[in-house]
């Protein structure tokens, strides 16, 4: 009887653990870019150029983006023109753009907290999008920190630390490698010059 009880306890624990570890979220990065030499007529400029790009968070078939409105230099949090939105998929071309996706296992509690944040932040953004303020990298870090994946920062420190996507991407890639999380990458088309992950900045 004792052996049977131990086996039952083991299977219950294994079942609960497996169930709790099946939740995953994606952190998606689009790399900054500009038209390659000789392709300025064919390719358009993009916001931010080489230091541009984008980052968003995907979970449960929904993508949370933080996008500009009137793109002010300084935020107007009382009347924000930009903010969070929910989309069905990433907006960039996954076949020809350069991107990286980090797949992160999370607990059921973290997953549900994220779903609630997606709903509440999309309904009412907690801050405005601004050139010298919260942008996609800092906003994404804020969301990830609120579900316990990273240390929470005050907005001022968050903005300074994650001023553009590459700064967050390098941190996330190192963190993912240290934790053996799955990383998917795709090289972009040669008609654009793409940002690399080399260098401090």
Residue ranges with predicted function:
Residues 49-52, 104-107, 111-114, 129-137:
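Solvent-exposed, acidic/flexible segments
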Residues 19-23, 37-39, 43, 119-201:
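Activation targets extended, charge/polar-rich intrinsically disordered C-terminal tails
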Residues 4, 28, 81, 172-173, ...:
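Residue-level detector of intrinsically disordered/flexible regions characterized by low predicted structural confidence
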Residues 1-3, 17-19, 58-64, 148, ...:
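Generic structural signal for short, solvent-exposed loop/turn connectors between secondary structure elements
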């Amino acid at each position: 009887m004792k052996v049977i009880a131990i086996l039952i306890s083991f299977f219950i624990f294994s079942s609960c653990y497996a169930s709790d570890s099946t939740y995953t979220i994606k952190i998606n990065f689009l790399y900054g870019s500009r038209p390659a030499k000789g392709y300025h007529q064919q390719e358009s400029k993009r916001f931010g150029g080489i230091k541009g790009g984008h980052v968003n968070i995907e979970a449960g078939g929904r993508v949370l983006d933080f996008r500009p409105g009137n793109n002010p230099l300084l935020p107007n949090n009382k009347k924000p023109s930009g903010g969070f939105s929910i989309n069905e998929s990433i907006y960039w071309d996954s076949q020809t753009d350069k991107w990286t996706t980090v797949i992160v296992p999370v607990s059921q509690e973290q997953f549900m907290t994220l779903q609630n944040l997606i709903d509440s932040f999309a309904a009412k953004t907690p801050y405005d999008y601004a050139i010298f303020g919260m942008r996609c990298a800092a906003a994404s870090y804020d969301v990830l920190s609120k579900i316990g994946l990273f240390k929470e920062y005050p907005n001022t420190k968050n903005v300074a630390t994650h001023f553009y996507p590459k700064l967050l991407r390098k941190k996330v890639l190192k963190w993912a490698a240290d934790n053996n999380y799955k990383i998917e990458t795709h090289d972009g088309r040669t008609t654009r010059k793409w940002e690399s992950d080399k260098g401090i900045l």
